[in-house]
């Protein structure tokens, strides 16, 4: 049986996705060297340098990584300097997790301390668990204790990320209330006075989707422990086109793919389609039915990347509206028959009318009709 490639023979450069602190190590080093501002206790960079890392700095050759609401980034950084946790809420695909990763990488140098909220998340996942072999052999001890990411963050004075917190049952969410208020964790198995005190620099960044299934409302007591920031979809058309093109180039370059000709007007067509189906309104103000499916910028990049791969390997290396139409099915055809009807209506009316005046839109319409019969 093949065991695949051993970890030692797999260089980090071949990793599908590196953590931000590894991917942008050179940028972080330049920011650290040039950072003359005061740093909060436990922070790797000053607040100004954290902002530069996320929003970019041409002088230091630091790339922009988060697009959209710059003041939101400032407020998030300020929140993390205080005693409140940071709650990033918004629709799926609006880069909440990306922003939390970037903040953790810049502030703590470690974005990997993460609790993933699910229906199966238990108190042990938030606090600590035990190595039961050692527990049976030695009894309760520090050696037998298995620290959770939150425990490690408290001990080291770092940020911990809590992804999709509203997927956890309410009684599990509320475990955080005392931890965030008292900044200490009781460990009764190690003695009546055993406790872990959070070190300076510790805080929590949580994310929650506003429009998703299988979520639980947070208690008002827990909400009071967080400052809420809403991450909204990008509304500026040209800005979103530039972002999708930049992300697509990064994906193609990172995947080692041969060059693909990506016309801007094809990406603009994709972004227009996503924005109109997301907003339930066309560019000229005509009201249409929006979709239940997530039509985020991240999904647009996924569609563009899949279409570019199809163009490269099957259709001569030039991305056209034909590939976009084919890959759009994967976004819409998930679990909503109503969405399929709405998209067909969109193609039969809006796209068809534009196709009378524009060759790309005609290709888009004809390809979609052939695929979506």
Protein language model annotation of sequence segments:
Residues 225, 243, 306-310, 327:
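A general alpha-helix detector
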Residues 312-373:
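C-terminal engagement/docking regions of AAA+ P-loop ATPases
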Residues 70, 248-319:
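Conserved AAA+ ATPase small/helical "lid" subdomain
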Residues 23, 49, 149, 239, ...:
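Exposed alpha-helical structural elements
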Residues 99, 276, 330-334:
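A short structural micro-motif
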Residues 76, 270, 274, 327-328:
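Short alpha-helical scaffolding segments that buttress acidic/His motifs in well-ordered protein cores
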Residues 2-257:
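AAA+ P-loop NTPase catalytic core and its hallmark functional loops
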Residues 46, 122, 146, 161, ...:
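A diffuse structural propensity rather than consistent per-protein peaks
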């Amino acid at each position: 049986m093949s065991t695949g490639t051993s970890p030692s023979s797999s260089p980090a450069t071949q990793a599908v996705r590196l953590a931000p602190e590894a991917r942008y190590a050179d940028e972080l080093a330049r920011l650290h060297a040039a950072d003359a501002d005061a740093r909060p206790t436990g922070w790797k960079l000053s607040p100004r340098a954290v902002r530069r890392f996320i929003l970019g700095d041409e002088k230091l050759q630091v790339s922009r990584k988060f697009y959209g609401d710059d003041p939101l980034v400032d407020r998030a950084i300020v929140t993390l300097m205080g005693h409140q946790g940071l709650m990033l809420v918004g629709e799926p695909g609006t880069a909440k997790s990306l922003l939390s990763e970037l903040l953790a990488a810049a502030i703590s140098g470690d974005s990997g301390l993460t609790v993933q909220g699910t229906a199966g998340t238990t108190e042990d996942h938030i606090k600590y668990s035990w190595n039961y072999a050692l527990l049976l052999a030695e009894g309760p001890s520090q050696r037998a204790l298995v620290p959770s990411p939150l425990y490690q963050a408290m001990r080291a004075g770092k940020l911990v990320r809590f992804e999709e917190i509203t997927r956890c049952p309410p009684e599990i969410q509320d475990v955080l209330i005392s931890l965030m208020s008292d900044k200490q964790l009781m460990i009764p198995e190690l003695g009546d006075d055993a406790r872990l005190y959070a070190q300076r620099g510790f805080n929590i960044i949580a994310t929650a989707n506003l429009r998703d299934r299988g979520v639980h409302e947070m208690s008002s007591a827990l909400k009071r422990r967080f400052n809420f920031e809403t991450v909204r979809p990008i509304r500026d058309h040209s800005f979103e086109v530039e972002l999708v093109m930049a992300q697509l180039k990064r994906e193609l370059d990172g995947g080692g793919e041969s060059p693909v000709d990506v016309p801007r007007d094809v990406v603009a067509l994709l972004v227009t389609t996503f924005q109109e189906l997301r907003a339930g309104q066309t560019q000229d103000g005509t009201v249409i039915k929006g979709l239940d499916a997530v039509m985020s910028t991240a999904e647009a990049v996924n569609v563009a990347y899949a279409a570019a791969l199809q163009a490269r390997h099957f259709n001569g290396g030039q991305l056209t509206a034909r590939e976009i139409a084919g890959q759009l099915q994967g976004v819409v055809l998930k679990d909503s028959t109503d969405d399929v009807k709405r998209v067909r209506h969109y193609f039969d009316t809006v796209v068809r009318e534009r196709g009378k005046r524009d060759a790309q839109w005609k290709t888009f319409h004809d390809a979609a009709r052939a695929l979506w019969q």
